[in-house]
C-alpha cells in the first residue's frame, strides 16, 4: 500500500479514535527526551552518560516510549496492562538498577550500554508522566487544562491532552533527529520483570510484538497526525498556548525533571540504592543525602488508549532483526518522499489560489533591518522585552529576556540581554547576542526561568534607572515554583550591578512570583513603583492570581530581602483559575495612574453560584480590572462576552485621532475570540481568530467602546500582543497588533504551518465601529486592508509577533518583533527582528 493511499484512511482512523485519548504520546515523550539530552552534563566515574545516550539513540528513543507499550487493547487484548503500569514507577527502576549491577559490572559492553540507554529513556517517561498527569501533585498540566478548558473535568482533559500533545508536537516541531531504527533489550527486560514480580509475567513474543506496534504507531504519527491540529486547537487553547511553557508539566518542565532523574539513575547504577530514598512516585526519589520534597502519592495513570488498526502494519515492511539480547526495528524513512512532495505541491497551489502567488502588497514588509539571535536552543529569546535609556546617553536601549536559556549542566536558568542604542538606533546588523550583546545578566537557580518579565524604574530613587527581572519558576527543584523578582541597581556611570541588590520572594507554593512586571506610580508620588503580577498564585484559592506593588524609595538598601506578603499594595483575583495578573498595564489619565489588570480565564463562576449546572458556565470569558491606586477597589471592569475569548490577555494604551478628534484609548485583546468570516455569501466561524477592542479612556466613567479589530484566520491569536507608539513623529500613536499563530493558508494547518503577522495601523486613520469589517474584497474580516504596514514573518513556524516593543532614539522609533520559536540561530531558540518604519 502506498503512503499516499494510506494517508486518508489513517487520518480518519486517528481522528475517530482521538476522543478516547491515549497514553501521554509517543511524539511528546520523544521530544522531551531529546530536549533533556541537549544540556545534560553527566560524567560520573568511568561513564560519560551524555555520550552514551547520544551513541545509542536507537535504544534511548525506544525506551522513552516503552512504558506505555502494553496498555492498548491491540497489544494482546490489553492483558498486560498491569505490566505497563508497573513500568511507570520507582520499583521498576529499582529492579532495573539491581539487575544491571548484578549482571553487568563496569566496564559495560555495547549491549549493556544500550540497556542503560533504554533505561534512561524509561526514566524520562516516568518523570514526565507524573507532572503531566498530576500524579501525586496538584495543578499539573492536565489537571489545570481540565480546570481551564473542560469545566474542571480531568478525564476530558486527559482524553484530549494525551493525544493532542502528539498532534501539537508533530505540527510544531521538526523530528529530523528521530532514529530510523529502535532497539528493545528484550532478554534483559524479561530478567528485570522477573526480578520485579518474583515470577515470569510476560514473554519475549509479547514484548517484541507490542513494542513493534509502538514503532509503527510512531510511523503513523510522523505521517499524518499533524493534520489533526485544527481539531485539537479548537478543543483546548490551553494546550496550544501552554504546551511548552506551563510551569508544572509543560514540555520544558518535563525535560528539566528528566535531567534530574538521569542524575539519580546514574548515581544508583554506580553506587547502588542503599543511600537513596525510593518512594513509589519517581519524582520524589532522593539520593546521596538529599531531602525528599515530599513523599507524594502513587496514583494509577488509568490511561485512555487508542487502538491502531493493522492497516498501518501492512504499510511498513516488518523490518525486525534479532540480536543475542534484543531486537531492532527499522524503517527506511519516517516521512515518505512521496508524501513530502504532495504536501509541498498542495501548499504551493493553495497559497497561489488564496494569496496570489508570490506577489506581495506594497504595504508588506518582509525583510527586517536586522535580526538578533542566540546559538543555544530553546532559549525563548524575546519572551519579555522592555525599552529605556539605561546608560543615560539620550537613546533608548533594548532589554530582552530569554527565560529558557540553558548551558551544559544548567537547565533553564535564563538570561537577560542589554543592547544599547545610539544615533542610528539599535545596531543595524545581525547579532548573536551571546557574543555581541552589550551586557548579559544570567540567572542562578535551576530552571528558575530568569528573564520571564522585565521592568525598568528608579527603585531606590537615586536618579539612576534600575532593572527588575522576574524568575517565576525559582523553587522548581523543590516542586514549589514560588518564584522570585530580582532588582539590579544602576550606577551613575551607566553600568549595572552584576548581582541582584534586592530579592523579592513569595511564601506560597506555586506562587510563580515575577510572571509579569510593570513600572507604574501606585502611591501618587510621581515616582514609578514596582508592580508584580502572579497569575498562577493561589490568592486564597487555586490560581486566582495576585498583583502586588512595592513603593520606590531611598530606604531600599543593597542586599535587601523582601516578601511579597509584605507588599505596600495588594489585590487578588476573584475565582480559582482566573489568572488575575496575567497582563498588567499602567497609564496616566488626568494626572492619575490607572492600573489595568487582565484576568483572561475569568468565567464569572461566582455569579453563577449553584443556580446553574457547571456545564452552563462560559469558559474563559476574560475580564479587565481598572484601579486608581492606592485604592484597592476596582474603579471599573470590562468583561468578555464570548466563551474562550480570553479578553484581557493583552493590554495597551495611547493617543489616536478618531474621526478627527484626539482620543486617549485603551486596547484590550481577546486573542482566542471566535469571530465570523464572510466569503461572498458563505459564512464561516473563525475559531480563535482573535479580536481587539478599543475603548475611550476617561477618569470619571466606564471606558466607552469605540472600535473593534478582528483577525482573518482561525487560531491566529490576532491581538495576542498589542502596543501603541508614535512611529512617524506626528504626535499620534500607531496601533501595532500581532497574530503570532496566524497560518497563511485558509485550511488552518492541513497544508501549511504558522507564518505569523504584525499589523501596524496609522494613528490618524482610526474610525468608529468595526475597523476590519468594512472590506473592499469579497472576504471579511480584512485586517490588512486598513493597515499601513503588514510585517511578514521571515521564517515559518517561528511565532513571529510573540512579543513586541518600540525603542526610541533621537532620530527614529524602531519596532522590535520577537519570534519566540525561531530557529534562526539554534533550534527553537527565538529571534528578534528590528524594523524602522515611518522614518524614511
Curated annotation (Swiss-Prot):
Q: Would you kindly state one Gene Ontology biological process term found in this protein's UniProt entry?
A: cellular response to insulin stimulus
**The entry's keywords:** Glycoprotein, Hydrolase, Lipid metabolism, Repeat, Secreted, Signal
Pfam families, sorted: FG-GAP (PF01839), Zn_dep_PLPC (PF00882)
Does the keyword section mention Repeat?
yes
Q: What class of enzyme is it?
A: hydrolase
Its GO CC terms are: cytoplasm; extracellular exosome; extracellular matrix; extracellular region; extracellular space; intracellular membrane-bounded organelle; lysosomal membrane
What quaternary structure, including any partners, is listed in this protein's UniProt entry? Answer: Monomer.
Q: Which residues are glycosylated?
A: 94, 271, 292, 307, 321, 501, 568, 591, 604, 659
Does Hydrolase count among this protein's keywords? Answer: yes
Compartments where located: Secreted
Q: Which GO terms describe its molecular function?
A: glycosylphosphatidylinositol phospholipase D activity; phospholipase D activity; sodium channel regulator activity
Residue windows of the FG-GAP repeats? 367-428, 436-497, 499-559, 563-623, 633-693, 704-770, 788-840
PROSITE patterns reported for this sequence = FG_GAP
For this entry, the protein name equals: Phosphatidylinositol-glycan-specific phospholipase D
Cleavable signal peptide: 1-23
- Looking at the record's lineage, which domain of life comes first? Eukaryota
UniProt lists the family membership as follows: Belongs to the GPLD1 family.
Gene expressing this chain? GPLD1
Give the E.C. number(s): 3.1.4.50
The organism named in the record is: Homo sapiens
The record's catalysed reaction(s) read: a 6-(alpha-D-glucosaminyl)-1-(1,2-diacyl-sn-glycero-3-phospho)-1D-myo-inositol + H2O = 6-(alpha-D-glucosaminyl)-1D-myo-inositol + a 1,2-diacyl-sn-glycero-3-phosphate + H(+)
Function field: This protein hydrolyzes the inositol phosphate linkage in proteins anchored by phosphatidylinositol glycans (GPI-anchor) thus releasing these proteins from the membrane.
Q: Which residues form a coiled coil?
A: none
Amino acid at each position: 500500500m502506498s503512503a499516499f493511499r494510506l494517508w486518508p484512511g489513517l487520518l480518519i482512523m486517528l481522528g475517530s479514535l482521538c476522543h478516547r485519548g491515549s497514553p501521554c504520546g509517543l511524539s511528546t515523550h520523544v521530544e522531551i527526551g531529546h530536549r533533556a539530552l541537549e544540556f545534560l552534563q553527566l560524567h560520573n566515574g568511568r561513564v560519560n552518560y551524555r555520550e552514551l545516550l547520544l551513541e545509542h539513540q536507537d535504544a534511548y528513543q525506544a525506551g522513552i516510549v516503552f512504558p506505555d507499550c502494553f496498555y492498548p487493547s491491540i497489544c494482546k487484548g490489553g492483558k498486560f496492562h498491569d505490566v505497563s503500569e508497573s513500568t511507570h514507577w520507582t520499583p521498576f527502576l529499582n529492579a532495573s538498577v539491581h539487575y544491571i549491577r548484578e549482571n553487568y559490572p563496569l566496564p559495560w559492553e555495547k549491549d549493556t550500554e544500550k540497556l542503560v540507554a533504554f533505561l534512561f529513556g524509561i526514566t524520562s517517561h516516568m518523570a514526565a508522566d507524573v507532572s503531566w498527569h498530576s500524579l501525586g501533585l496538584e495543578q499539573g498540566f492536565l489537571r489545570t487544562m481540565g480546570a481551564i478548558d473542560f469545566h474542571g473535568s480531568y478525564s476530558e482533559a486527559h482524553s484530549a491532552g494525551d493525544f493532542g500533545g502528539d498532534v501539537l508536537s508533530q505540527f510544531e516541531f521538526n523530528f529530523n533527529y528521530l532514529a530510523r531504527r529502535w532497539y528493545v533489550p528484550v532478554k534483559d527486560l524479561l530478567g528485570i520483570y522477573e526480578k520485579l514480580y518474583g515470577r515470569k509475567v510476560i514473554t519475549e513474543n509479547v514484548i517484541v510484538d507490542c513494542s513493534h506496534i509502538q514503532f509503527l504507531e510512531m510511523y503513523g504519527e510522523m505521517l499524518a497526525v499533524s493534520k489533526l491540529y485544527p481539531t485539537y486547537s479548537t478543543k483546548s487553547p490551553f494546550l496550544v498556548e501552554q504546551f511548552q511553557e506551563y510551569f508544572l508539566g509543560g514540555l520544558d518542565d518535563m525535560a528539566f525533571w528528566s535531567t534530574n532523574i538521569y542524575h539519580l539513575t546514574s548515581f544508583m547504577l554506580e553506587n547502588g540504592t542503599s543511600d537513596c530514598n525510593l518512594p513509589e512516585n519517581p519524582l520524589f526519589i532522593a539520593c546521596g543525602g538529599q531531602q525528599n520534597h515530599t513523599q507524594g502519592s502513587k496514583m494509577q495513570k488509568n490511561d485512555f488508549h487508542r487502538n491502531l488498526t493493522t492497516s498501518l502494519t501492512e504499510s511498513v515492511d516488518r523490518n525486525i532483526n534479532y540480536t543475542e539480547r534484543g531486537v531492532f526495528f527499522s524503517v527506511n524513512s519516517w516521512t515518505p518522499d512521496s508524501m513530502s512532495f504532495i504536501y509541498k505541491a498542495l501548499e504551493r497551489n493553495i497559497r497561489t489560489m488564496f494569496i496570489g502567488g508570490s506577489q506581495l502588497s506594497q504595504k508588506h514588509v518582509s525583510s527586517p533591518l536586522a535580526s538578533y539571535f542566540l546559538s543555544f536552543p530553546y532559549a525563548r529569546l524575546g519572551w519579555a522585552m522592555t525599552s529605556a535609556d539605561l546608560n543615560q546617553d539620550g537613546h533608548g536601549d533594548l532589554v530582552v529576556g530569554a527565560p529558557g536559556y540553558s548551558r551544559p549542566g544548567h537547565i533553564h536558568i535564563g538570561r537577560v540581554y542589554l543592547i544599547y542604542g545610539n544615533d542610528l538606533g539599535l545596531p543595524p546588523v545581525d547579532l548573536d547576542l551571546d557574543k555581541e550583546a552589550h551586557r548579559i545578566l544570567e540567572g542562578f537557580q535551576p530552571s528558575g526561568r530568569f528573564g520571564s518579565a522585565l521592568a525598568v524604574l528608579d527603585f531606590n530613587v537615586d536618579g539612576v534607572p534600575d532593572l527588575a527581572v522576574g524568575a517565576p519558576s525559582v523553587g522548581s527543584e523543590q516542586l514549589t515554583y514560588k518564584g522570585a523578582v530580582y532588582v539590579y541597581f544602576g550606577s551613575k556611570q551607566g553600568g549595572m550591578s552584576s548581582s541582584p541588590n534586592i530579592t523579592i520572594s513569595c511564601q506560597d507554593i506555586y506562587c510563580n512570583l515575577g510572571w509579569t512586571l510593570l513600572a507604574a506610580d501606585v502611591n501618587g508620588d510621581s515616582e514609578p513603583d514596582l508592580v508584580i503580577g502572579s497569575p498562577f498564585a493561589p490568592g486564597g484559592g487555586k490560581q486566582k492570581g495576585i498583583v502586588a506593588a512595592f513603593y520606590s524609595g531611598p530606604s531600599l538598601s543593597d542586599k535587601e530581602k523582601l516578601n511579597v506578603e509584605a507588599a505596600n499594595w495588594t489585590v487578588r483575583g476573584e475565582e480559582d483559575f482566573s489568572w488575575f495578573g496575567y497582563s498588567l498595564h499602567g497609564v496616566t489619565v488626568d494626572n492619575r495612574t490607572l492600573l489595568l489588570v487582565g484576568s483572561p480565564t475569568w468565567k464569572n463562576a461566582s455569579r453563577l453560584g449553584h443556580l446553574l449546572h457547571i456545564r452552563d458556565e462560559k469558559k474563559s470569558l476574560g475580564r479587565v480590572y481598572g484601579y486608581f491606586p492606592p485604592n484597592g477597589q476596582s474603579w471599573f471592569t470590562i468583561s468578555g462576552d464570548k466563551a474562550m475569548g480570553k479578553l484581557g490577555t493583552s493590554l495597551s494604551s495611547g493617543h489616536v485621532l478618531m474621526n478627527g478628534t484626539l482620543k486617549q484609548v485603551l486596547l484590550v485583546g481577546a486573542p482566542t475570540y471566535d469571530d465570523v468570516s464572510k466569503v461572498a455569501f458563505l459564512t464561516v466561524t473563525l475559531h480563535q481568530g482573535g479580536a481587539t477592542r478599543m475603548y475611550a479612556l476617561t477618569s470619571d466613567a466606564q471606558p466607552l467602546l469605540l472600535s473593534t479589530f478582528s483577525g482573518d484566520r482561525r487560531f491566529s491569536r490576532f491581538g495576542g500582543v498589542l502596543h501603541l507608539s508614535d512611529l512617524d513623529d506626528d504626535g499620534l500613536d500607531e496601533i501595532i497588533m500581532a497574530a503570532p499563530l496566524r497560518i497563511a493558508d485558509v485550511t488552518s494547518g492541513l497544508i501549511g504551518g504558522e507564518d505569523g503577522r504584525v499589523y501596524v495601523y496609522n494613528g490618524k486613520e482610526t474610525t468608529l465601529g468595526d475597523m476590519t469589517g468594512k472590506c473592499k474584497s469579497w472576504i471579511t474580516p480584512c485586517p490588512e486592508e486598513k493597515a499601513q504596514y503588514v510585517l511578514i514573518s521571515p521564517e515559518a513556524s517561528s511565532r513571529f509577533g510573540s512579543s513586541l516593543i518600540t525603542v526610541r532614539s533621537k532620530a527614529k522609533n524602531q519596532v522590535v518583533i520577537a519570534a519566540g520559536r525561531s530557529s534562526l540561530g539554534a533550534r527553537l531558540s527565538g529571534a528578534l527582528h528590528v524594523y524602522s518604519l515611518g522614518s524614511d
